[in-house]
Design a protein with these regions (language model features):
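C-terminal end-helix/capping segment
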Residues: 59, 142-170
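Helix N-cap/coil-helix junction residues
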Residues: 77, 97, 119-120, 156
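Catalytic DNA-binding helix-loop module of base-excision-repair DNA glycosylases/AP lyases
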Residues: 34, 106-152, 178
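N-terminal polyanion-binding entry modules of DNA glycosylases/AP lyases
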Residues: 1-105, 109, 167-195
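A short linear-motif detector with a strong N-terminal bias
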Residues: 43-44, 64, 117, 158-162
Length: 195
């Protein structure tokens, strides 16, 4: 990581996040859910189609619950993701989840609260911690782009498993988010990171 950091003296760790649409925690959760198994570009296009259904804005939880699931499917959202979006919207609408409360939770509590939602796993919750809450010690070991960046940075002859990424990232504590940002940036701008 030292060479990657030294090679980028003017690096802005938030620049890659700034390339994403502006979003609060709820928006980041929608982005992460819609973006499961998709590229950032495909996620953006799908979100744009969703916004077109709601007069150009992301739907509130109440709007999402009132929406015809078929229209969301036509916008490119899979049935499984529609179920996840609806479960999240129900929990936010009935008070089982509250974005203000979630924002104040520790990372572990946040992860536990969100992964209780059907269809939200660690990658989705970790992404929201990183993108919306900008927590300092988050890594997304399940993210394929990050795994490829770690492979390149550490000159591995194989794509590291999620467990290998977690083990490698232990060295980055308590600034795993910063290291993740360097690696994502290198992956997105096409440079070859070195450790």
């Amino acid at each position: 990581m030292a060479r990657l950091i030294d090679a980028r003296p003017d690096f802005d760790p938030h620049a890659w996040i700034a390339q994403l649409p502006p979003m609060d925690l709820y928006g980041a959760l929608l982005f992460q859910i819609v973006g499961q198994q998709l590229s950032v570009a495909a996620t953006r296009r799908t979100l744009e189609r969703i916004q077109a259904l709601f007069a150009g804005h992301l739907p509130s939880p109440a709007e999402l619950l009132a929406a015809d699931p078929g229209s969301l499917r036509q916008a490119g959202v899979s049935w499984r993701k529609i179920g996840t979006l609806r479960d999240l919207a129900e929990r936010l609408s009935d008070g089982r989840l509250d974005v203000d409360v979630l924002s104040g939770l520790s990372d572990e509590e946040f992860m536990a609260a969100l992964t209780a939602v059907s269809g939200i796993g660690p990658w989705t919750a970790q992404g929201a911690l990183l993108i919306a809450l900008q927590r300092e010690d988050v890594v997304l070991p399940g993210d394929l782009a990050l795994r490829k960046a770690v492979q390149s940075a550490y000159q591995l002859d194989h794509l590291p498993s999620q467990q290998e990424v977690v083990a490698i990232a232990e060295k980055w504590r308590p600034y795993r988010s910063l290291a993740t940002s360097y690696l994502f940036s290198a992956a997105f701008d096409g440079t070859s990171p070195s450790p």
